[in-house]
């Protein structure tokens, strides 16, 4: 079940890439082999699912909003892959979900993929939205490293008001240092 995400993500990438003309270059991909860990990335649009498919590490799960369960096909594949869903409208439930995930990650040697902005930015400039705290609370709770992954701004390729133009996209995994974090966030 834990390899479902990898198979679906890679299949989606190799099927979609020629249709939309997207060439993805991943820098420092070897950083994504570290497990268990928390991968955080910037979230621009649904195009992120394409490049994520190219770089999706084996034994990885995604943290997503509960509403994704109801998106046709995507929701079913995410559920089958053992991904984790949080109810963003119910803080107590979201905290309970995050508290339970750490032991599961260690037991199964998993990487958790989180977009800490919590939503897609759709920005024409290479800016980030404010981060939600979940990924960082999880890092403190589990003492797992955070691996930042940065995708260049691709507004020049895709603006939600225009047709996707295709092109080259650079994504980089950033080196991390495993720090001993304080046990309170």
Whereabouts are the PLM-identified features?
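Soluble catalytic domains of membrane acyltransferases
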Residues: 18-176
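A general boundary/transition motif marking the beginning of the first structured unit of a protein
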Residues: 3-4, 161, 179
């Amino acid at each position: 079940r834990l390899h479902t995400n990898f198979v679906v993500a890679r299949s989606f990438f190799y099927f979609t890439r020629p249709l939309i003309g997207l060439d993805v270059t991943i820098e420092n991909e070897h950083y994504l082999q570290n497990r268990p860990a928390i991968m955080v990335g910037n979230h621009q649009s649904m195009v992120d699912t394409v490049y994520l498919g190219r770089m999706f590490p084996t034994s990885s799960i995604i943290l997503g909003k509960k509403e994704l369960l109801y998106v046709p096909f995507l929701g079913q594949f995410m559920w089958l892959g053992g991904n984790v869903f949080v109810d963003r409208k119910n803080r107590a439930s979201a905290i309970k979900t995050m508290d339970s995930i750490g032991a599961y990650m260690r037991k199964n040697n998993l990487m958790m993929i989180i977009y800490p902005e919590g939503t897609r930015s759709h920005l024409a400039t290479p800016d980030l939205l404010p981060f939600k705290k979940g990924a960082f609370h999880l890092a403190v709770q589990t003492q797992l490293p955070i691996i930042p992954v940065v995708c260049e701004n691709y507004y020049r390729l895709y603006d939600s008001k225009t047709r996707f133009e295709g092109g080259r996209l650079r994504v980089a995994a950033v080196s991390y240092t495993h720090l001993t974090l304080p046990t309170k966030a």
